[in-house]
Amino acid sequence: MHQENYTEKAIRTIGVPSAVSRMFGFNSPQSVFNWIKNNKVPAERVIQLCELGGWVVSPHQLRPDLYPNQTDGLPKQ
């Protein structure tokens, strides 16, 4: 069974990896490409990535190990 790459979906929602890399202040897009390859965003980047993507992908989808409930990490309404 194929697991959806939510990391790639979150990044593509924002734009291309190089643009996302610049938004995070990285000198190179390599870190962002590694996130996609491993389908894992560093814990300290999850909320910002979701926010930049307009919450199309949730923290729970990106890191269910850190955000076990579907609404964890989402902004309060």
Label the model's feature ranges:
Residues 26-40:
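Recognition helix of helix-turn-helix/homeodomain-like DNA-binding domains
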